[in-house]
Amino acid sequence: MIYEWVPSGKPKEVRKISLQSSPGIMKLSPFPEKELGLQPGKEYFLQVVIHCDPDNPSGDLVDEASIEVVKMPASVQSKLNRAANSVEKANIYAEAGLWYNALDEALKLAQVSKLGEVGSTLLKDLAKWEAPKTIPELPPKQREAIEKRIENLKQIADSAR
């Protein structure tokens, strides 16, 4: 599910997507190419639910994240225009903190349902980038969620090559 944060109330549902799960890395494009997707300058809330047992919904795995969609900075676009391949593009995106774009480029280099070497490295880098956010000033629940996400990223990076 993708929701848009609405300042004056309840998050607005933007898209609900159902997928048939398969082993390994699954790539999802929530919007058709011709459809306008998430808008720069807006903040969204993503929720992924994996139904492990249809008869036991309390056992579902749930993860959530907030993302802010930003306009592509001109300096990043300029570097991308000069990039020779997907490895360079993935690194440019990662250096700019555009992790979804970076992973999208990395997956172009990997076998189907695999993360690949570049993708694995990116996830490890993302885990390092997330680590400073576990500072003691955060509420325990938020800090624990970030710590869990970091461990999950490391585990995926090591197992899905």
Predicted regions mapped to residue ranges:
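Hydrophobic beta-strand segments within extracellular beta-sandwich modules
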Residues: F45-L46
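Extended, polar beta-sheet/loop recognition surfaces of beta-rich domains
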Residues: P40, C52-E88, I92-A94
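Signal that preferentially marks extracellular ectodomain short beta-strand elements
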Residues: P23-P40
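Well-ordered beta-strand positions in beta-sheet-rich domains
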Residues: V14-K16, I25, E64-S66
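Alpha-helical protein-protein interaction scaffolds
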Residues: N81-R161
